[in-house]
């Protein structure tokens, strides 16, 4: 309602829309009736297809004036290499079985991380319903200091653990100081070992 009342743009980052684990279909905001001039969808080849380094994405809107401005900006900028554009376009020819297989694998990995985290006292988190990462509050005062300890001092048979302190994901200062972001992008055994190290 605020979008219409104040004539705002509603941006929707939909790069993970295929990676929802409950079986439900995620609706695109482009499907909202009456918001055609307000909705702007962002998509990315690198995230959708795990194509790290493919700096190709798109902006989608039914707002012709906005898209005209976007095209002017795009024409003034250098673009991605032609070969990368061709390769990225080919990725969109994959069938739904690709996303089903990737989704199933990420769900297995998520379930492994959740199962192992539940064994650790004092960790607080929500089980993600999509994407391939989760945020967790650790029973520490400062996740960044804990990360430095893990990298500089901790060693278990030559292994340690690296994660992303979550404070930088928040706009409000001092929020998420004891939180970490973990991406479950490695195999099951490595995930189990990582949770053991944590």
Model-identified regions with their sequence ranges:
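PLP-dependent class I/II
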Residues: 1-198
